[in-house]
Amino acid sequence: MAAGMVATMVLLTCLAAGGLVVGAEEDGGGGGLGRLGSPDYGDALAKAILFFEGQRSGRLPANQRATWRGDSALTDGREENVNLTGGYYDAGDNVKFGYPMAFTVTLLGWSAVEYGAAVAAAGELGNLRAAIRWGADFLLRAHASPTTLYTQVGDGNADHQCWERPEDMDTPRTLYKITADSPGSEAAAEASAALAAAYVALKDDGDTAFSSRLLAASRSLFDFANNYRGSFQSSCPFYCSYSGFQDELLWASAWLFKATRDAKYLDFLTNNQGSSNPVNEFSWDNKYAGAQMLAAQEYLGGRTQLARYKDNLDSFVCALMPNSGNVQIRTTPGGLLFTRDSVNLQYTTTATLVLSIYSKVLKSSGSRGVRCSAATFSPNQISSFATSQVDYILGKNPLGMSYMVGFSTKFPRRIHHRGSSIPSIKVLSRKVTCKEGFSSWLPTSDPNPNIHVGAIVGGPDGNDQFSDNRGDSSHSEPATYINAAFVGACAAAMGQKQVVKLEEPADNLESMVSTY
């Protein structure tokens, strides 16, 4: 290869550490491309965390920064004499779905556990911990007895027929739950994983009583999921599981072993690894890749009985890395991992988080990398590819579009989000009715009056095209689990100093260099 081409490749793949940290601003100011064309990761991280304050349900605290929001859903749970206030609205509607909410908390906890130092350096660890606790508090309340977990608050069908602010909503706050007689092992195990991850992330926060509650509830939920096995598919109206519950049981046991070092959870992982399978996505439904990542971390730490998980995780990497010879998930012409058209960035951000963590673990263990059929990828190459996904989301793409609201100057202005698209209750104090929202606020081409800073939308299509259309929920709607995975991925990019070694296979390097 010519020396000039090598130098160009080094320049393109060396990412800046993020520059000055810029605090998240409510109006979306600041941010953009810094030196060498790298995004300001510190600003993006701050805004990704701020997003969760705009998704809060319940009575808002005095230090609420998304000031366009107000209190909402203050009587949730009353019909069954249980307090189910708080938690997060999952996306652009006003329903609280416990299953993806728990996954959101798990991902936020994982981000804090793996990248707490980088988040702290950005001045955002307190805000991240607050986001974790807001969701974990709800999950604790939802676990009303050893064999009860409330999994949804609100009637999804009725809610989706209205377009109104959460502060105004008058649709039924119907309660859904799993019990010993109507189990949902996926939901119970995911809640267990969430509380275990929250415990690991928050145990040094000074509130020992709260930490003890997290761990006790996590253990209880795992027992509920494991002892009363049944699929959530038969007891859910929305966010039903299609991958079964074995992945969540592995995921929860891996988190509980990380949290407690209790041998019974390691034994569960060891004895059930036959149910671990190679996958090409990581999502609110399919947790295999996450469980494999946690177990592979233990394998590389000396627990060689967990070898199958490491092998499966290597297959996951090979399914994603361009030119691996085993690619299952294609990249768009602009370089974005593209799993499916609807809400694709949820899969991109979760995959990027796993790739980022795995590259770090491989490097710390002294591993040379992952061998695929056509190439071997070093930890640096894996992390470079992961960073390219973060950069794409933040604007290094064919459209020059940041898919994070409020980051840089070109970002989605008409996101599919009820609260963002109707003037704040603090500005328009009268009630906006269900039908008025549909006729007056959903169809307008005007930008949303409330900039939902940090919200990451579903993203572009397979040809890198994006229509900023409020009615297009598949591409314009944000979701908590998109942002939750991005927090860790962005922190990884921020703390990383890329050094491309010239002895690495040139064709592998070229496949990961973005020209945008």
From Swiss-Prot:
GO cellular-component term (any): extracellular region
Any Pfam family: Glyco_hydro_9
Name of the protein: Endoglucanase 20
Active site: D93, H416, D468, E477
Glycan-carrying positions: N83
Keywords annotated in UniProt: Carbohydrate metabolism, Cell wall biogenesis/degradation, Cellulose degradation, Glycoprotein, Glycosidase, Hydrolase, Polysaccharide degradation, Secreted, Signal
Enzyme Commission number, as recorded: 3.2.1.4
Reaction catalysed by this enzyme: Endohydrolysis of (1->4)-beta-D-glucosidic linkages in cellulose, lichenin and cereal beta-D-glucans
Alphabetical GO biological process terms: cell wall organization; cellulose catabolic process
Signal peptide residues on this chain, from the entry's feature table: 1-23
Alphabetical list of SUPFAM superfamilies matching this protein: Six-hairpin glycosidases
Domain of life: Eukaryota
Subcellular location: Secreted
Family assignment from sequence similarity: Belongs to the glycosyl hydrolase 9 (cellulase E) family.
A GO molecular-function descriptor: cellulase activity
Family matches, as Gene3D superfamilies: 1.50.10.10
PANTHER family for this protein: ENDO-1,4-BETA-GLUCANASE
KW Secreted (keyword) present: yes
